[in-house]
Amino acid sequence: MSGDIIDELTWRGLIAQSTDLDALRAALAAGPLTLYAGFDPTAASLHAGHLVPLLALKRFQRAGHRPIVLAGGATGLIGDPRDVGERTMNSSDTVAEWARRIRSQLERFVDLDDSPTGAVIVNNMDWTGPLSAVDFLRDIGKHFSVNVMLARDTVKRRLEGDGMSYTEFSYMLLQANDYVQLRRSFGCRLQVGGSDQWGNIIAGVELNRRLDGESVHALTVPLVTSADGKKFGKSTGGGSLWLDPEMTSPYAWYQYFVNTADADVVRYLRWFTFLDREELAELERATAERPHAREAQRRLAAEMTTLVHGEQHTRAVQLASQALFGRGDLRELDEATLGAALREAAGEGEVARVTPGEPATIVDLLVATGLAESRGAARRTVNEGGAAVNNQKIADPDWTPADGDYLHGRWLVVRRGKRNMAGVLRDGN
């Protein structure tokens, strides 16, 4: 039934820490195991870093086990302690709305059906909300040693700095209680999470033992960083790489992964996709022998975009990538994809704008987009054959766009040479 999911996770490099693996293998072999991972609504969307534990649940489900996905409506109000200081306290209404939005994202990654492996989605506010302070302190707090809690690395670092509120200090107890409640209600016996959650997860293992004399398991997946130690999942503009397409466009998502470094791409393929060993070995060979072709990066970007946004968006962004660099018809692109691509190309800057009724020549456009430093440089670019609009070369420095030149009535794609491209947006449309 399970194949050997532990071997699968091991060769993919997806086990950071665990309780006794032999005991876990035995539990998995005995029949369908129920496991869970939790995701706190600390923003309106999950981000790319959440995918590793979320996909781990999916891998277990494919191997014949039942995942529980927990949206932390209660723990999201408290906040897991960080090294960098207290989290902002968001309102109950805000966290509830974020939990609702995140739940809809979580539902896309696991199979919700009536089979023995059908996933369950829960919110820990359902059992934490009714819990009184007295019951919390007597029934849960009694089983925790303050000395052990103070020994956590994050707690020690915070106490050496500006300190920590009791609110965040108590987060571990709430997460531990989640594990107890899920075991009691669903027979859950494995918690999966990021390696930064190890202390909280082990607290849940211990609380199950202390309260009910029950033995349960824990497994963490690695936190994702690049080979040079940079934090994974930051977009071009420096913000998080969100799963919500309104917060990170499918085009920006695709471009992030297609620009993955050679040193990271095979590891990311192991962690983020379901490609088998043979496919991964071939892509690893391609990266070593033909790095310029970026076959592994393009496959990673396609797999990740399809996973999060669907095949239709993958095809659209691939078409946009080709068309924007002169290898396709820009007029075939839908406006949302075209606009997202041109805004992404602007990075942290603003997309250049033109006002209807105020003629702008190709020289004006090159300067406005920053593709030329001066009007003289722009003229030289045109005279040397290096200027193009919508993939059509422009040879006249006095050329101005007609209404029909604007894609979807709004956009121009201006290029200097083969690799330097920017968008121009016409106001008032």
Swiss-Prot record:
Superkingdom of the source? Bacteria
Where, in this chain's numbering, is ATP bound?
A: 234
Question: GO biological process annotations for this chain's record?
Answer: tyrosyl-tRNA aminoacylation
Stated EC number for the protein is 6.1.1.1
Cellular localization per UniProt: Cytoplasm
Q: Which reaction does it catalyse?
A: tRNA(Tyr) + L-tyrosine + ATP = L-tyrosyl-tRNA(Tyr) + AMP + diphosphate + H(+)
Domain called S4 RNA-binding: residue spans: 360-417
Q: Which GO terms describe its cellular component?
A: cytosol
Give the InterPro entries listed for this entry.
Answer: aa-tRNA-synth_I_CS, aa-tRNA-synth_Ic, Rossmann-like_a/b/a_fold, S4_RNA-bd, S4_RNA-bd_sf, SYY-like_C, Tyr-tRNA-ligase, Tyr-tRNA-ligase_bac-type
Task: Explain the purpose of this protein.
Answer: Catalyzes the attachment of tyrosine to tRNA(Tyr) in a two-step reaction: tyrosine is first activated by ATP to form Tyr-AMP and then transferred to the acceptor end of tRNA(Tyr).
User: Record's family?
Assistant: Belongs to the class-I aminoacyl-tRNA synthetase family. TyrS type 1 subfamily.
Record's subunit section: Homodimer.
Name of the protein described by the UniProt record: Tyrosine--tRNA ligase
Which gene is annotated as encoding this protein in its UniProt record?
tyrS
